[in-house]
């Protein structure tokens, strides 16, 4: 009998699942939407922690084994817009740690509602652990396509232009459905692109016909590579890639999308794979993402052996 490699199910090309996923502890409850940065010889992971409605921090060296969680930013019920905070991006710049995050306000009675409002907030830290936030959001939903929700900021510092660049998701409350773009000189005052949204669902691709959201942008080889979630419907999601010369226009989708989709029956990520974060380390590409089974999301690791992820882009 031929044995099937279960780590390869739902993975394109040289991608595979780490065999002992999920990588964060079960007793932490639901964790999701991570940012990973390298500081010296250590990796720092910032994550959304569902049971506390907070953003937490862990450290490690190999991308698999992590320290205990430390909450770095908690909800602030006095501001009126961040009863729940999550979906963060953290940059280290000029000796400071800069964080943009999603603040959510639920409308109506009950702990979880199907409607609400979300904005993007900003905080700074000297050590990456103790953050001081601005009281007001730095970006709010204003345009028709944004509806009442902005989420999932991804920010890069453009050294050549001396400017911050943000890609963000907007639209639906639980899962924003399109991706927009904005620029800022100080990371606080943002100007949205006049042609937003810059990236939309593709109705001819069943795996991303409903929603595209929560991207990471990775500059490489003269392109801006976008790793993003594509939704077939509200419950089934995959990881996909597109690229653009300027990160705004002319997006070209990877012809072998999706690169990651649900795992084998009964596995922790059988129904959906969400919110990618990719990093190159030791001759491999590491991609952390949320997997979902039933209503539970957990963070796992996917590995690409070899340096060239897209050698078959034009095949």
Where are these regions (language model features)?
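Carbohydrate-active catalytic/glycan-binding domains of CAZyme proteins
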Residues: 1-315
């Amino acid at each position: 009998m031929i044995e099937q490699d279960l780590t390869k199910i739902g993975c394109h090309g040289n991608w595979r699942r780490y065999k002992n996923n999920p990588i964060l502890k079960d007793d932490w409850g639901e964790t999701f939407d991570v940012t990973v940065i390298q500081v010296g010889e250590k990796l720092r992971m910032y994550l959304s922690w569902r049971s506390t409605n907070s953003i937490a921090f862990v450290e490690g060296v190999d991308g698999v084994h992590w320290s205990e969680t430390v909450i770095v930013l908690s909800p602030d019920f006095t501001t009126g817009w961040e009863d729940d905070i999550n979906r963060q991006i953290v940059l280290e710049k000029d000796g400071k740690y800069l964080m943009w995050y999603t603040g959510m306000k639920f409308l109506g009675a009950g702990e979880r509602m199907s409607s609400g409002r979300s904005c993007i907030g900003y905080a700074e830290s000297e050590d990456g652990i103790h953050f001081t936030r601005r009281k007001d959001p730095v970006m709010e939903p204003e345009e028709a396509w944004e509806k009442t929700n902005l989420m999932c900021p991804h920010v890069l510092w453009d050294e050549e232009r001396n400017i911050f660049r943000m890609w963000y998701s907007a639209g639906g409350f639980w899962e924003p459905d399109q991706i927009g773009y904005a620029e800022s000189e100080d990371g606080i005052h943002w100007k949205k692109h006049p042609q937003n949204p810059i990236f939309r669902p593709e109705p001819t691709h069943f795996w991303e016909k409903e929603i595209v959201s929560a991207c990471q942008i990775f500059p490489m080889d003269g392109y801006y590579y976008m790793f993003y979630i594509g939704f077939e419907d509200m419950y089934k999601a995959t990881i996909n890639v597109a690229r653009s010369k300027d990160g705004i226009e002319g997006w070209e989708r990877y012809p072998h999308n999706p690169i990651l989709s649900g795992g084998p029956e009964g596995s922790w990520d059988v129904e959906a794979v969400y919110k990618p974060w990719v990093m190159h380390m030791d001759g491999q590409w590491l991609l952390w993402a949320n997997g979902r089974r039933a209503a539970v999301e957990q963070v796992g690791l996917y590995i690409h052996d070899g340096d060239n992820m897209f050698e078959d882009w034009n095949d």
